[in-house]
C-alpha cells in the first residue's frame, strides 16, 4: 500500500484537534485542512439559502457548488468572511446534521482530497483517517473527557466553567458526540490503525510534541 504524506487526526468536537493539527502542520511546513469546516460551511450555506438541514437532496446540491474560498486563516463563503460565523454551537450542530447524509459526504469527499499536494498535509475531522485519507502515514484519534472539552470551549469564549451557559455547552457537546457516533455513514470511532491520544491531562504543547514524536517514528 502506498502511503500518503498525510497526518490524519480524528476525534470528537472541542477535543482540540484543530489547534493541534494546525500547529503540527506549521512545525512540519505542511498544509492544514479542517475537514469539519466544509460541513460547517455547508450547514451555514443551507441556512442562508433557506434549505432545511434534513433535506438531503437540496443540501447535497448546495454542497456540490459550495462557493467557499480558504484564504490563509480566513474562510469566505460567497464572498463573505464567515471564519467566526461557522464556529458557533448552532452551526456545529448543523454540521453534524448535514454530515449524516451520504450524498453530502460524497459531494465534499473529493474536495477534501484535493487539498493534498506534494508539500504534505495535516487534516483533522471525524473520518479523515478512515474515509478521506485511508492511506495516511499517521492516523490519530484525539479525544478528551466531555467536561474537559466543555471547560476548554468555555474558556475560549470567555465564560465561567459553571452555570447555565456552561451546562448548555456541555450538553451540546454530549449531544453532538451521540449524533456523530451513531450516524449510519462514517460514524465517529477510533479506527484499528489509529493511535489513541487522550488530551484530558495534556497541554496543547505536550500534545503537539507527542504527535510530532510519533510522526518521526513512522
UniProtKB/Swiss-Prot annotation:
Annotated GO CC locations: cytosol
Major site of localization recorded for this protein: cytoplasm
Locations listed in the record: Cytoplasm
Coiled coil location: none
Binding site for ATP: 11-19
Entry-linked SUPFAM superfamilies: P-loop containing nucleoside triphosphate hydrolases (SSF52540)
GO molecular function annotations of the record: ATP binding; CMP kinase activity; dCMP kinase activity
Protein name per the record: Cytidylate kinase
Gene transcribed to yield this protein: cmk
Amino acid at each position: 500500500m502506498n502511503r500518503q504524506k498525510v497526518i490524519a487526526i480524528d476525534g470528537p468536537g472541542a477535543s482540540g484537534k484543530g489547534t493541534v493539527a494546525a500547529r503540527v502542520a506549521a512545525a512540519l511546513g505542511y498544509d492544514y485542512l479542517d475537514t469539519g469546516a466544509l460541513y460547517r460551511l455547508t450547514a451555514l450555506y443551507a441556512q442562508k439559502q433557506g434549505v432545511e438541514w434534513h433535506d438531503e437532496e437540496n443540501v447535497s446540491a448546495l454542497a456540490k457548488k459550495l462557493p467557499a474560498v480558504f484564504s490563509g486563516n480566513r474562510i469566505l463563503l460567497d464572498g463573505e468572511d464567515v471564519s467566526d460565523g461557522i464556529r458557533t454551537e448552532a452551526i456545529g450542530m448543523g454540521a453534524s446534521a448535514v454530515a449524516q447524509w451520504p450524498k453530502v459526504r460524497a459531494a465534499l469527499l473529493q474536495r477534501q482530497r484535493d487539498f493534498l499536494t506534494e508539500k504534505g498535509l495535516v487534516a483533522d475531522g471525524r473520518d479523515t483517517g478512515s474515509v478521506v485519507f485511508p492511506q495516511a502515514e499517521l492516523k490519530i484519534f484525539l479525544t478528551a473527557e466531555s467536561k474537559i472539552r466543555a471547560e476548554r470551549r468555555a474558556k475560549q469564549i470567555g465564560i465561567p466553567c459553571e452555570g447555565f451557559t456552561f451546562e448548555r455547552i456541555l450538553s451540546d457537546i454530549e449531544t453532538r458526540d451521540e449524533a456523530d457516533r451513531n450516524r449510519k455513514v462514517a460514524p465517529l470511532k477510533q479506527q484499528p490503525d489509529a493511535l489513541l491520544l487522550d488530551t484530558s491531562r495534556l497541554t496543547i504543547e505536550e500534545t503537539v510534541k507527542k504527535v510530532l514524536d510519533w510522526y518521526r517514528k513512522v
